[in-house]
Regions:
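H-loop/switch region of ABC-family ATPase nucleotide-binding domains
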Residues: 202-203
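A short, surface-exposed alpha-helical micro-motif characterized by mixed small hydrophobic
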Residues: 208-210
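Catalytic Walker B motif of ABC-type/P-loop ATPase nucleotide-binding domains
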Residues: 166-169
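Conserved ABC ATPase "signature" region
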Residues: 116-137, 185
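Helix-to-loop junction immediately C-terminal to a conserved catalytic motif
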Residues: 51
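The feature captures the beta-strand-to-loop junction immediately N-terminal to the Walker
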Residues: 36-38
Length: 255
């Protein structure tokens, strides 16, 4: 596989709690990889290490063949690694356009590498807000947004650096059916039109089956299964249980 991202032997502890125990995970160019596991399995910690939000105790992160293990989160963002968070938007007091502008300025080198000049900042902002369906809410403070609009804001901020890889942490959780469908369509368009790779963290096997090329299942800080999305429920008991529960109730569990 032509790996865009390779995380090798990643270990992380918080005090005496060993969260990750030598995980290795790869994402190919243009690939959508699902990351499945129960609460506390280390999914979010792994994403935070890949994005540079936290550093590993041991292991190495390579992105486009370059060792980025000690790079800051801002530097990785400029290099093309973006992340959305389970609890959206770090700037609740900013308006939508202000929040996206912060991300766009942070990603300025990547934006210019894509052929944009500084004078096009406002045009780029408008384009991002139109693409993510937030133009009408551009002057709203983030604290006033619905859950669906907050997820859109996370997407707008993430794609502002023209990323090669986006880490999506439970981005489809706690959404209405309409919001989920629209965000799925946005993700697919970004994948199809821009060739963006995704690492999609979800406790919902139906979402993983629908969107992913491959799924990696982790538990207790280790990879214990990897394969085709359609085989997840056959080999992973937690996925089989979740699959049946969602089929019966139409609801997602907490994950």
């Amino acid at each position: 596989m032509n790996d865009l991202l390779l995380a090798e032997g990643i270990a992380k502890s918080f005090g005496t709690n060993r969260v990750l125990r030598g995980i290795t995970l790869a994402v190919g160019r243009g690939e959508v990889v699902g990351l499945f596991g129960p609460n506390g399995s280390g999914k979010t910690t792994l994403a935070n290490i890949i994005s540079g939000l936290i550093l590993p105790d041991r292991g190495r992160i390579r992105f486009e063949g370059k060792d980025v293990t000690r790079m800051t989160m801002d530097a990785r963002f400029r290099a093309g690694i973006a992340q959305t968070f389970q609890i959206p938007d770090p700037y609740p007091s900013l308006t939508v356009v202000e929040s996206v502008r912060v991300a766009l300025l942070c990603g300025q080198p990547a934006r210019q590498a894509g052929g944009k000049e500084k004078g096009g900042l406002e045009e780029e902002l408008d384009s991002l807000l139109l693409r993510t369906g937030l133009f009408a809410q551009r002057f709203w403070p983030a604290a006033k947004l619905s859950q669906g609009c907050l997820r859109r804001l996370e997407f707008a901020r993430a794609i502002s650096c023209r990323p090669r890889l986006i880490l999506l942490d439970e981005v489809f959780s706690a959404l209405s059916a309409r919001d989920e469908a629209e965000l799925v369509a946005l993700m697919r368009a970004l994948h199809r039109e821009a060739g963006i790779s995704f690492l999609l963290i979800s406790h919902n096997p139906l979402i993983l089956e629908e969107l992913c090329d491959r799924v990696v299942a982790i538990e207790d800080g280790r990879v214990f299964w990897e394969g085709r999305p359609g085989d997840l429920a056959k080999y992973v008991p937690a996925a089989n249980h979740a699959h049946g529960h969602e089929a019966e109730t139409g609801e997602e569990g907490q994950g």
